[in-house]
């Protein structure tokens, strides 16, 4: 129905236009496709209703369920070129249990268009034709207003591999003239990802633009130290290869005493609910393993071996992270590449339980 003049409008507007055309025309050649289109709209409505019911957390989710192609991550996102960064706003998934099921990487085209790459489905979607439009319209858009997903080579057989993600993003950059996400650097607003422009060879990257990822203001004081600690772990030329911060995990930190219920009074002080929240950045590496970095403590560890494991575990993956090799826990001589800067004494186990709670 792309030829119809109202293509791209909200579904209810399309239905009204189709009904108006059907009621005004007597030509069967025009009426038949219009009726077919109205029936297909009804199917889309039913499908969307089931989709929203499946993701429901409260009654309002039926009305405000986010479209599948929305960027659902607990991040502030700022887009722009150079030092002038244009804030987009707080982006958060309100209707999904796990933030991992909806991890996306935001991309900016050389022409200024904004794209989003859905990691799990290995799909690239065009969000807006410019950062200004993206800022104005934001992510609270109806699903039908999104442009169609871009055609990419279907390699989802190895979709759980991190290398596949880099390959897809590199291919998208070459095919659709995009800027891909590279390393991490520090700005006044927080941590920013360098946008790298691929020239010819997908593995050749040239700095082109900058995108900033920041968190709520209470964590601003953590950024300089966190960035320094992260650079200490993931130094230049690291064996794990290129890396990027692709999301933020948060869960209630396990404490000895359980948190009081919401709206209870403890010592004449009303408590807002769980107060200790553990936050970890999800770091994707080219070599494969997904890392978790705790900005408040500077700890870093292997979170999962693949996205499939991470999707299966959800935020619960943060509970068992000390089962992997970590500084102070690995055997002498068995230094994992992530821990090569920590040199334990050869011949005996390290006594100091570093990086542990």
Swiss-Prot record:
UniProtKB keywords: Activator, Host-virus interaction, Oncogene, Transcription, Transcription regulation
Span list, region Interaction with host p53: 107-187
Pfam families: US22
Induction: Detected as early as 18 hpi.
Assembly notes: Interacts with host p53 and inhibits p53-activated transcription.
Family: Belongs to the herpesviridae US22 family.
Function: Involved in transactivation. Displays transforming activity.
Protein name per Swiss-Prot or TrEMBL: Transactivator protein DR7
Organism (species): Human herpesvirus 6A (strain Uganda-1102)
Gene: DR7L
